[in-house]
């Protein structure tokens, strides 16, 4: 009765802990996205659990006979708009596109990943280190959680913290990053990072 003393974890762990194919896949993701060397698997399981919740909600709505009006229509629109704000879908996506989101799309929306994609850090590992040590801010809010899911409108105010040594544009690190950024220019728009292929042409790392 009443509220539980401790909140239950929403993260679902693998049903079979020793499947080699899954272990190899998760090790590859851990290296690609610069996750914790010890405990990085839990970060992947957390994203998979969140993805599973999005898919279950979408499948429930797709299975309805009529979602063109009423409560289910609003629920469908709310889900799509929510995922658009999170950068997992682009504007104009449909409820079917939710099923094409995968765990890499989820991992790419972590603050750590976006810091790297935005050219604020030379690697995923470096991005994690900079966030943990307080060198990254969203607006005036200093961020220290690499796994924070950044929203699309927050990307424009993502920057170095005001009290960080890297906030100085003449800092040697900033000079080197600018040179590196110029050599890594591509034709893809950075705001399309993390969007499902059904809604955009390419998935950019």
Enumerate the predicted regions with their spans.
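DNA-binding alpha-helical recognition surfaces that contact promoter or target DNA
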Residues: 129
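Beta-rich strand-turn-strand
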Residues: 121-125, 133
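Ferredoxin-like alpha/beta domains used as RNA- or RNAP-binding modules
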Residues: 1-118, 137, 141-205
């Amino acid at each position: 009765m009443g509220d539980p003393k401790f909140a239950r974890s929403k993260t679902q762990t693998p049903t079979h802990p020793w499947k080699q194919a899954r272990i190899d896949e998760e090790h590859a993701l851990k290296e690609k996205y610069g996750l914790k060397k010890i405990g990085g698997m839990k970060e992947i399981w957390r994203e998979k659990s969140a993805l599973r919740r999005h898919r279950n909600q979408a499948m429930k709505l797709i299975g309805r006979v009529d979602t063109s009006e009423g409560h289910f229509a609003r629920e469908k629109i709310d889900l799509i708009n929510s995922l658009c704000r999170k950068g997992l879908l682009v504007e104009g996506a449909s409820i079917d596109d939710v099923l094409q989101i995968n765990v890499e799309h989820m991992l790419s929306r972590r603050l750590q990943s976006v810091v790297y994609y935005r050219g604020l850090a030379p690697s995923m590992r470096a991005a994690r280190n900079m966030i943990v040590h307080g060198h990254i801010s969203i607006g005036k809010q200093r961020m220290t959680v690499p796994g924070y899911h950044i929203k699309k409108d927050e990307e424009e105010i993502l920057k170095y913290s005001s009290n960080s040594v890297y906030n100085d544009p003449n800092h040697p690190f900033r000079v080197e990053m600018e040179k590196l950024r110029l050599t890594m220019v591509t034709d893809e728009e950075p705001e399309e990072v993390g969007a499902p292929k059904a809604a955009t042409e390419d998935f950019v790392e």
